[in-house]
Amino acid sequence: MIPIFIIVHNQYEILKKSVESYKKYINTPIEIIFHNVYSTYFETINYLELQKKKGYKVYDSKINDHHTVIDSIKDYIKHHPICEYIVITDPDIELFNVNSDIIEFYIFLLNKLNVQSVGPMLKIDNIPNFYPNKNQVIKGHTNQFWSKPVKSILFKNTNYQYIECSTDTTFQLFSTKNIPKEFPYKNSIRTLAPYSAQHLDWYINPNDLYPSQLFYLNNTTKISHWNNKKWNGKYYNNNINIINNFFINKYKYIYYYNKCKCKNNYNFGDFITPYIYKILFLKDAILDINGGSKKEDVIIGAGSILSSCNSNSIIWGTGFMFGNEKINKPKKILSVRGPLTRNRLLELGIQCPENYGDIALILPYFYYPEIKKQYKLGIIPHYIDKEKFNKIYINNDENVKIIDVTESIETVIKNILQCEMTISSSLHGIIVSHAYNVKCMWIKITDNIGGGTFKFRDYYGSLKINNYNTLLPYIYDKQISTQEIINLINNYPNPTFPINTKLIIEICPFINIKNKIH
């Protein structure tokens, strides 16, 4: 039995395809083992949990470092001392039309040629034209690998070709007595067809992505031939991927509320839709101040701003503020924030699909920094509540973080991620906490928030949570302990994490996503 260690970090569709290829093409008995490198994407997490239930071994790393796979391998060898060989691979290496004795061939080469590892050459003759960096890949791999001398070796009465070159984690077979301490390594070979492989990242169409691919490409700091490249005179890396330069821009007008009476007129929840737009297209959207007065279509997204729509508005995840507004019929409704908003639209004779979800829930697709927990509790007052909150709450607990919603979106996200759990009188404080798998409790500090409780009830309805209640400000007046608040949060209804947000991203009006609902 040959163990195949697959290093996983947020891949899903590609991972499944690679696993299927190993089961299909390898006739040697294998054991597939997953090494999870701090994955945060919900489909990846759920997939790995399912594999555990099926009996597969899943190692979990608490840090995003693929070198941690070495520790997992050492642990495996410790418990399987008779294991002689092991395969280490990234999740995007697919075996395609290879001879089924590939493992047997690799063991033969490893011993015959006395090298540290054996793996496949990556095909470059079938990379599709829609892959933006096709020419760079071909040139780079030709210079690095294909330009090297090709050698032959006889195996089972047939000559097969290989190249002596450095390797990393592209389906590499090792002896368990010679496991590397780090990658890459030089004393290795790569085999040509019929023992080659495909690098699935090179077959991604930027205008026909799976949701998992969008999440992965925007949240991975280094992917071979995708980012860390120079484009338009700038380097885009660390969560802004050069793939975004190739998205087809379907809409350029957005309506969002930008007149809040707070610091710099900036409430982070109001700017979520233009933030997503800029991540996608690396430029600002055009603000339509009237919600659809232009000749071109206007996207209305995050916020309680549905009452601002017009006949050429496209509604994506927005909601009503009060629940009794009358509106112009929009051009199209893709989704709304929750069922209360939908019910009001139906009362007005406007058809609305049962597609729910605030746009803030998909922020992790575009920005998911690695942040260590530093606080037991985060408190997120609505900007309208800030003055009263400062009077009734004195923060003298080093375990508590006060989060300011008038800071930038990325700052608020980072601050929330620093906390083990939160309480919030800001709706988007609650939603963003949930989006990043942080337990949150809705609190009420004043009666001054526009719309009262409608938008909160609308959002909770989208999660099918009905047994919530507001926690009144007396908890501050009595200055109950942080631990008492934590106990309350632990008993407060929260969604099952991670939240399934595929529907919201699949109907994103800005780009084409596979499995898109029309």
Q: Predicted segment positions?
A:
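A conserved acidic beta->alpha catalytic loop
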Residues: 35-47
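N-proximal low-complexity "stem/linker" segments adjacent to membrane-targeting elements
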Residues: 1-20
